[in-house]
Each structure stands twice: as structure tokens, then as C-alpha cells.
Design a protein with these regions (language model features):
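P-loop NTPase motor domains
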Residues: 1-222, 237-238, 302-308, 312-322, ...
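Short, glycine-/Ser/Thr-/acidic-enriched flexible segments
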Residues: 165-168, 204, 229-232, 259-261, ...
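Conserved ATP-driven motor cores of ASCE-family P-loop NTPases powering translocation/secretion/packaging/pilus
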Residues: 214-216, 220-316
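A composition-biased, non-transmembrane "mature-region" signal
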Residues: 331-335
Length: 394
């Protein structure tokens, strides 16, 4: 369980654990996911200078923490704190490592060339969005690892449950987007257990790699289930191209009442059927009947936009050994409400995972979280101090 609102009911997990970051491209993916979740408008501007600059800078910091002392301080909170140190201290430290020297050359060129306004803009575009994630509770959950994100590992299978908070959607969504992107990379492999990625209210997070996961994960026994209100939400938050890939690559779709473009898109997806039409004309002498055929929508948009509660339309896909003759449906899904109520009556509250009690039984949660927050700040101060002394000695 990952629960940012209540640390008592949350495990701790470091999404950029050094054991699962083998290359600087992993650091870039993590930085990319975080930045685009914090700045949804950047999804439409990928490749722009002031979009790529903060991603490159944060990726360099993450990879530096991965190679410094074998990843001892490679956590997301440490990366945020290091980013917020003076750039006059951070840049010399990062560029003292050969694998990061070329990575940061655009920043060094601006600094050494006196383009201070440009440099300030590049750095601010990284610092400002990430500063929204400076939170002792967030730092607590993301700074240690009580489990790993390879949920379908045959040696350590697990079910991971995470939840967002509508009041803090922009902040938590960025953190959850990072967890999701790391999970996708780890589970979409051969030789793992069957697994499922189930995401409700998908547009609340930017899920990098979602289109690729849908397209390739089936062969690796990963099922993807996505829930959202309307296709237009997906286009708004993922961009037109990526949204179309997601919409067109899913094999099964279930839809309740939707209107507008979404209803038209679904109607087109369900296809057309040859319909017979009979027309009768009556005059004084006789009655004439004509019959013709015409291709009409199998489920027209007007029917989709007028569905009542419990009525669904959709299509399902089959495979070689399990053929489905009737792939398109328009039906009522019957729910056994009594059974649902009985099941809900047996629900158990999320258990206390960390009770934060000292030897005398006193509640010390606030102090423990604050101590962890301050320790991360001290760690980063010490890293900068030691590294500057090393550089001065060289």
C-alpha cells in the first residue's frame, strides 16, 4: 500500500532504487515522467528547449546520486534537495563525472558564456514545479524501500494498491506517475507471473509508456485495464497522437452513456451493418412497395448518448482457441446488489503498517517524519560539502 495521506497505513518505496537503474536512460525516463506530470501542458511541447532542459538537469542529478557511493543516497527526495542547492555548487560536482560532463554541456555553455538569464530560466523551470513536491510526508514514503516494484516477480509476487487524492491531485499524481512508469518497465518482461495493471481515472496521472505497454504487454502476460470518463480527457492530458494510440490499441472496450465525439468514435468502432429498408407509396390507382439495402451504424451515436444506468455497449476480442461470435454488444449488465452489499459489509479497514510508537507507547509519527525530512537535507549538505572538498583537492 502506498498512501501519502496517512503514513501509518503506507509502506515505503523508493521509485528510483539504484538496483533497478542500470543506465542513465532510466534516470531520464524518471525525470521525464515527473516533469510531464507536474506540467501537463508540456506533453504537447515535447522536444522544446525549455521542456527538455529541466528534464536533462533532473536526470543528471538522479544519475549522479545513482553513481555516488553506489547509490546510497539515490532517492527521489534526495534528488529534489540536491536540485535546490546553489547551481554554482551543483554544476562543478556533476561535471566532475565523465558520464555527466557532456550531458550538462548546454548548461555549462550558458554559464561560462555569460547567458545568465537563459541559465536562470532553465534552472527555474526545473526547480519551480519540483518544489511543489517538497513535503515531509511525501519524503517519508519515497525515501526508503520496504518492497520492490517488480510486482510479478515469481520470487516475490505482490499486489500494490495506490490511491490519489482529488485535493492534492497534481502533486500525488506526479509521484504516482513515477511509480507507474517504473512498474511498467519492471513487469513487461518474459518469464514473470501473470499480472494486471488497473488504473481508474487515468487522466489524473501522466503514464509514460502506456501506449507501448498496451501494445506489447499481452505477450508478457500483463493485462491492462483503464478507466476514464471520456476520450476528450485523454486527448487533453496525453495529446492527440498518444491518446489515439491508446484508444485504438485496446482490444476490449465497455462504455456507458457518453456524448459528442466519444459517442461518434465508439459508433464508428462498432462498425456498420447492412439494413433492409422498405418504402411504401400510395396513390389513387395502386400501392407500390420498394425494398433497398443500406449500410447503417450498428450502434448509432444517439443510442450511445441515451443509455440508461446499467446499460452498456462495447466490443470484446478473442483468440485462436476461444472464438467469440458476437463481439459487439449492447446490453444491461446485471449486478447482484445484495451480494455486493454483503461483500461490502465484510470490508476491513486498511491495517496500521507503521504505528509510530516509542518504547513508552507515545505517538511519535510527526517527529519521525520530521527527523527523516531533516536527515535528507543534512545528507545533501554533506554530499555537497564532501564533493566540493574533493574537487578542490584535485
Amino acid at each position: 500500500v502506498i498512501n501519502f495521506d496517512d503514513p501509518r497505513r503506507s509502506h515505503r518505496c523508493n521509485p528510483i532504487h539504484p538496483d533497478f537503474m542500470s543506465d542513465i536512460s532510466d534516470a531520464y525516463e524518471s525525470a521525464y515522467t515527473i516533469m510531464l506530470n507536474l506540467n501537463k501542458t508540456w506533453v504537447q511541447k515535447q522536444g522544446d528547449f525549455f521542456v527538455e532542459s529541466p528534464i536533462i538537469l533532473f536526470a543528471a542529478i538522479i544519475w549522479y546520486l545513482r553513481i555516488y557511493k553506489n547509490g546510497k543516497y539515490c532517492t527521489f527526495p534526495h534528488a529534489i534537495e540536491l536540485l535546490n542547492r546553489r547551481y554554482e555548487d551543483v554544476f562543478p560536482i556533476l561535471t566532475s563525472y565523465p558520464e555527466l560532463e557532456n550531458y550538462l554541456s548546454p548548461f555549462m555553455d550558458a554559464w561560462q558564456g555569460g547567458a545568465m538569464e537563459q541559465l536562470a530560466g532553465q534552472i527555474a523551470s526545473a526547480k519551480i514545479p519540483l518544489s511543489r513536491m517538497i513535503s515531509p510526508q511525501l519524503y517519508w514514503v519515497m525515501s526508503a524501500s520496504e518492497f520492490t516494484l517488480d510486482i510479478n516477480n515469481p520470487e516475490e509476487p505482490k499486489i500494490l494498491c495506490v490511491g490519489n487524492n482529488p485535493d492534492r491531485q497534481n502533486i500525488y499524481g506526479a509521484a504516482l506517475g513515477l511509480y507507474n512508469s517504473r512498474i511498467v518497465k519492471l513487469i513487461n518482461k518474459k518469464g514473470q507471473l501473470k499480472s494486471s495493471v488497473i488504473i481508474d481515472e487515468l487522466p489524473t496521472i501522466y503514464f509514460k509508456g502506456l501506449d507501448n505497454l498496451i501494445a506489447t504487454a499481452r505477450s508478457n502476460k500483463v493485462a491492462v485495464c483503464l478507466g476514464f470518463q471520456d476520450f476528450s480527457q485523454l486527448v487533453r492530458d496525453y495529446g492527440d497522437k498518444e491518446a489515439k494510440v491508446v484508444i485504438n490499441t485496446v482490444g476490449n472496450i465497455f462504455s456507458g452513456q457518453v456524448v459528442g465525439e466519444t459517442a461518434k468514435t465508439l459508433s464508428e468502432r462498432f462498425g456498420k451493418v447492412l439494413q433492409k429498408r422498405q418504402s411504401i407509396s400510395i396513390n389513387r390507382q395502386d400501392v407500390s412497395t420498394s425494398i433497398n439495402t443500406q449500410m447503417d451504424s450498428l450502434i448509432p451515436p444517439s443510442k450511445i448518448s441515451g443509455l440508461t444506468q446499467g446499460m452498456f455497449v462495447g466490443s470484446v476480442s478473442d483468440n485462436f482457441t476461444e472464438r467469440i461470435e458476437q463481439k459487439i454488444f449492447h446490453a444491461e449488465i446485471v449486478v447482484d446488489t445484495d451480494k455486493v452489499k454483503r461483500e461490502e459489509s465484510h470490508y476491513q479497514p486498511i491495517p496500521i503498517i507503521n504505528d509510530f510508537k516509542d518504547a513508552d507507547g507515545n505517538d511519535c509519527m510527526k517527529q519521525a517524519i520530521l527527523d527523516n525530512y531533516n536527515q535528507i537535507k543534512e545528507d545533501v549538505k554533506l554530499i555537497v560539502k564532501d564533493e566540493l572538498e574533493r574537487i578542490a583537492g584535485d
